[in-house]
């Protein structure tokens, strides 16, 4: 979302006077005269009635009024501005419809970008900004990822408690429209806990696991097991279910579902979607150790019919998690490569061996080219001596 700098030609006193007159004309309970207590008291009273303009005003006109209020707010010293900013943010969440919600969103974004980057007030503005963005379906305009979020607060990082609150909100506003982003937010949330307070993050840990399992684009689930709050769930059904998705095959999930059907459903997880994901994960695991698989093997391991094998493999190839070739004539699937479901010490050793082999091959090529080059130089010198 773009934001324009705030520039108002009138003096602060003139702006305050005009705003008071405007809101009084709309029927707000406010005096048209300036406060003798100063501009901060004026702002408190103006902000207290500013939502009156939501009733009948045009969005473009309201945007101008809110812009004027913001231009005054950003002049207030930090130590005296917190209550004013919080009151304004709260008013911006009261927009009665989506068009006005977008106006309020733009106003908060303008305020956020005109505050000093080292101001702790930016956190509070951004939190309300996300709330308003949800109301008018503009979340991705203000939040595109965790890295972008951290960059915005680089000069004044919020406390761990504040970030936990913000991550929970971001999870809530993205879970229905972007599960992959929502899952990343929850993983980041769990990363804010330490060994000392991980035990109190039970609810967050469960949400994180459920979000990751439900996300159709999240397949590498092994890192979740290393998160401290997730470790505290060991022995719980949700941890057992996660472990199945991390390293077990489809039959293990089927058995778990038969034994704990009510639990799975109570978590908001869709059994058919779980089956679809577990089939793909099972196929990946089989591909790690089998360069070729018969259709018979796949029908047995994936619990599908032979007619479903080809469509299934095509769907797997679309994910780009596995590179393979269908051999319909011989009823086989030839595997070229696959992403590992888990990436532990064995995988690091395999990667090390692969890189070492590449290094040795490159050294052999270099030595060969050096020998060829030397031979050509010797030949050239010999021919020169002959002539």
UniProtKB/Swiss-Prot annotation:
Main location: cytoplasm
InterPro entries: ARM-type_fold (IPR016024), COPS7/eIF3m (IPR045237), eIF3m (IPR027528), eIF3m_C_helix (IPR040750), PCI_dom (IPR000717), WH_DNA-bd_sf (IPR036390)
Pfam families recorded: eIF3m_C_helix (PF18005), PCI (PF01399)
Compartments, record wording: Cytoplasm; Golgi apparatus
One GO BP annotation of this record: protein secretion
PROSITE patterns in UniProt: PCI
Domain PCI: 181-340
Keywords noted in UniProt: Cytoplasm, Golgi apparatus, Initiation factor, Protein biosynthesis
This protein's GO CC annotations: cytosol; eukaryotic 43S preinitiation complex; eukaryotic 48S preinitiation complex; eukaryotic translation initiation factor 3 complex, eIF3m; Golgi apparatus; investment cone
SUPFAM superfamilies according to UniProt: ARM repeat, Winged helix' DNA-binding domain
SMART domains linked to this entry: PINT
GO molecular function: caspase binding; cysteine-type endopeptidase activator activity; translation initiation factor activity
Quaternary structure and interacting proteins, as annotated: Component of the eukaryotic translation initiation factor 3 (eIF-3) complex. The eIF-3 complex interacts with pix.
Family affiliation: Belongs to the eIF-3 subunit M family.
HAMAP family found in the cross-reference section: eIF3m
Function per UniProt: Component of the eukaryotic translation initiation factor 3 (eIF-3) complex, which is involved in protein synthesis of a specialized repertoire of mRNAs and, together with other initiation factors, stimulates binding of mRNA and methionyl-tRNAi to the 40S ribosome. The eIF-3 complex specifically targets and initiates translation of a subset of mRNAs involved in cell proliferation.
Protein name as catalogued: Eukaryotic translation initiation factor 3 subunit M
Organism: Drosophila persimilis
Organism ancestry: Eukaryota, Metazoa, Ecdysozoa, Arthropoda, Hexapoda
């Amino acid at each position: 979302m773009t934001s324009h700098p705030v520039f108002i030609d009138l003096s602060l006193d003139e702006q305050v006077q005009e705003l008071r007159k405007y809101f009084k004309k709309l029927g707000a309970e406010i005096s048209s005269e300036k406060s003798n207590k100063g501009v901060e008291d004026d702002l408190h009273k103006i902000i207290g009635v500013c939502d009156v303009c939501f009733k009948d005003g045009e969005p473009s006109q309201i945007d101008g009024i809110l812009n004027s209020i913001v231009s005054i707010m950003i002049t207030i010293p930090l130590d005296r501005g917190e209550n004013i900013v919080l009151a304004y943010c709260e008013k911006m969440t009261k927009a009665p419809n989506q068009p006005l919600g977008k106006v309020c969103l733009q106003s908060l974004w303008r305020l956020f970008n005109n505050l000093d980057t080292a101001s702790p007030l930016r956190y509070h503005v951004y939190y309300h900004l996300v709330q308003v963005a949800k109301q008018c379906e503009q979340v991705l305009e203000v939040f595109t990822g965790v890295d972008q979020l951290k960059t915005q607060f680089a000069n004044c990082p919020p406390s761990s408690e504040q970030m936990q609150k913000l991550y929970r909100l971001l999870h809530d506003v993205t879970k229905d429209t972007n599960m992959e982003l929502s899952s990343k937010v929850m993983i980041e949330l769990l990363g804010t806990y330490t060994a000392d307070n991980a035990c109190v993050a039970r609810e967050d840990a469960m949400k994180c696991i459920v979000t990751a399992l439900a996300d159709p684009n999240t397949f590498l689930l092994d890192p979740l097991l290393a998160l401290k709050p997730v470790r505290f769930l060991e022995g719980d059904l949700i941890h057992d279910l996660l472990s199945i998705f991390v390293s077990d095959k489809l039959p293990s999930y089927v058995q778990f579902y038969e034994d704990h059907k009510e639990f799975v459903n109570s978590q908001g997880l869709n059994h058919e979607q779980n089956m679809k994901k577990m089939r793909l994960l099972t196929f990946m695991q089989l591909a790690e150790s089998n360069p070729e698989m018969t259709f018979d093997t796949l029908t047995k391991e994936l619990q599908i019919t032979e007619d479903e094998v080809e469509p299934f493999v095509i769907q797997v190839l679309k994910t780009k998690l596995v590179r393979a070739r269908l051999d319909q004539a011989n009823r086989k699937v030839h595997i070229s490569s696959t992403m590992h479901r888990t990436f532990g010490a064995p995988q690091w050793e395999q990667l090390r061996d692969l890189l070492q082999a590449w290094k040795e091959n490159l050294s052999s090529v270099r030595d060969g080219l050096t020998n060829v080059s030397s031979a050509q130089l010797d030949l050239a010198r010999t021919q020169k001596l002959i002539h």
